[in-house]
């Protein structure tokens, strides 16, 4: 498991445009009087003399007015395009550092090196978050498209950039709607798509449930996982429906399971779990009662 992101730099460009002091199409008039006549300044810098206009020769003023201003929008788009191209180059270099020699993808060995450079364990929650953002289809593999799209999604194009995104990803995963999306992604992520799997192996499901609930461990989770662990023969796999409904189960059923009803539309495995757990608690309670009373109803301190 692992993932990357592209950090797109968009430096802003604030190029000003020059405006002439005068409209070059206007005529410059001198006052009419004895010995004076109206003088017209030809457009685009062909003056009739070196008369100053606001401290600038007419030739210079007219030429300056005829210059077309540079569009700040065009300059900004060009700057953004250059930044995106540079970011793609950095992503290409990063991807090549970990990709397989024969396949255009990061496989298990490259994933280990990638996680090592990120200073994370391949089995920890942060790597699952990267896989979620990369929308990885398979564990221990990032295709070129997944890697590039994922890096762009988190705006990172370097190891340092990806590491810097971890805190915000952890925060995002605490949002109810985002966690639901992550939770459902995790089921698909655990499947072996190349083999056409439609349900998770029991051991894989247990590991993924522990992983996805890293930040928010529901009270019933440990009981549920104990049930799955202690009943291996009766549970071959976990379907998508069971996986998805378990999240609802943790949200509406209390830790004492007292408000669970078999009449509601829960998967049959949940009925079996609740029955098993209630029996276990009953036996546990009876065992504690027997220890506290001792033989013949005597308290332990009264026994010899």
UniProtKB/Swiss-Prot annotation:
Residues 86-278 form the DCUN1 domain. Pfam families: Cullin_binding. It is found in: Cell membrane; Cytoplasm; Nucleus; Cytoplasm, Perinuclear region. Residues 1-86, 284-304 are annotated as: Disordered. One of its GO terms (biological process) is regulation of protein neddylation. InterPro entries: DCN-prot, DCN1-like_PONY, PONY_dom. Keywords: Cell membrane, Cytoplasm, Lipoprotein, Membrane, Myristate, Nucleus. GO terms for cellular component: cytoplasm; cytosol; nucleoplasm; nucleus; perinuclear region of cytoplasm; plasma membrane; ubiquitin ligase complex. A lipid is attached at residue 2 (N-myristoyl glycine). One of its GO terms (molecular function) is ubiquitin-like protein binding. It comes from the Eukaryota. Contributes to the neddylation of all cullins by transferring NEDD8 from N-terminally acetylated NEDD8-conjugating E2s enzyme to different cullin C-terminal domain-RBX complexes and may play a role in the cell cycle progression by regulating the SCF ubiquitin E3 ligase complex, after UV damage. At the cell membrane, can promote and as well inhibit cullins neddylation. PANTHER family: DCN1-LIKE PROTEIN 3 (PTHR12281:SF31), RP42 RELATED (PTHR12281). Part of a complex containing DCUN1D3, CUL3 and RBX1. Interacts (via the DCUN1 domain) with the unneddylated cullins: interacts with CUL1, CUL2, CUL3, CUL4A, CUL4B and CUL5; these interactions promote the cullin neddylation and the identity of the cullin dictates the affinity of the interaction. Interacts preferentially with CUL3; this interaction triggers the relocalization of CUL3 to the cell membrane where CUL3 is neddylated. Interacts (via DCUN1 domain) with RBX1. The DCUN1 domain, also known as PONY domain, mediates the interaction with different cullins. The DCUN1 domain mediates the interaction with the N-terminally acetylated NEDD8-conjugating E2s enzyme leading to the NEDD8 transfer from N-terminally acetylated NEDD8-conjugating E2s enzyme to different cullin C-terminal domain-RBX complexes; the neddylation efficiency correlates with the DCUN1D5-cullin and DCUN1D5-E2 interaction affinities. This domain is also involved in CAND1-, cullins- and RBX1-binding. This is DCN1-like protein 3. The lineage of its organism: Eukaryota, Metazoa, Chordata, Craniata, Vertebrata.
């Amino acid at each position: 498991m692992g993932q990357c992101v592209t950090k797109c730099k968009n430096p802003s460009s604030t190029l000003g445009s020059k405006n002439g002091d005068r409209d070059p199409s206007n005529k410059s008039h001198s006052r009419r009087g004895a010995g004076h006549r109206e003088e017209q300044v030809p457009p685009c810098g062909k003056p009739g003399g070196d008369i100053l206009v606001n401290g600038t020769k007419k030739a210079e003023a007219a030429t300056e007015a005829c210059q077309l201003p540079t569009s700040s929008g065009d300059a900004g788009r060009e700057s953004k395009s250059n930044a995106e191209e540079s970011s793609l180059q950095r992503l290409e270099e990063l991807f090549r550092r970990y990709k397989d020699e024969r396949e255009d993808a990061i496989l298990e060995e490259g994933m280990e090196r990638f996680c090592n450079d990120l200073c994370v364990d391949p089995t920890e929650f942060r790597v699952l978050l990267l896989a979620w953002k990369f929308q990885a289809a398979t564990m221990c593999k990032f295709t070129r498209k997944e890697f590039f799209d994922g890096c762009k999604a988190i705006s990172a194009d370097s190891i340092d950039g990806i590491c810097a995104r971890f805190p915000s990803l952890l925060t995002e995963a605490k949002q109810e709607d985002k966690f639901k999306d992550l939770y459902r992604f995790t089921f698909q992520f655990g499947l072996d798509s190349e083999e056409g799997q439609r349900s998770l192996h029991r051991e894989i499901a247990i590991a993924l449930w522990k992983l996805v609930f890293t930040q928010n461990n529901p009270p019933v989770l440990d009981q549920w996982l104990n049930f799955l662990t202690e009943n291996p023969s009766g549970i071959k796999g976990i379907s998508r429906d069971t996986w998805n409904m378990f999240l609802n189960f943790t949200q509406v059923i209390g830790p004492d399971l007292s408000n669970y009803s078999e009449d509601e539309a829960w998967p049959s495995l949940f009925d079996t779990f609740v029955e098993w757990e209630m029996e276990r608690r009953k036996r546990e309670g009876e065992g504690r009662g027997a220890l506290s009373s001792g033989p013949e109803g005597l308290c332990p301190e009264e026994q010899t």
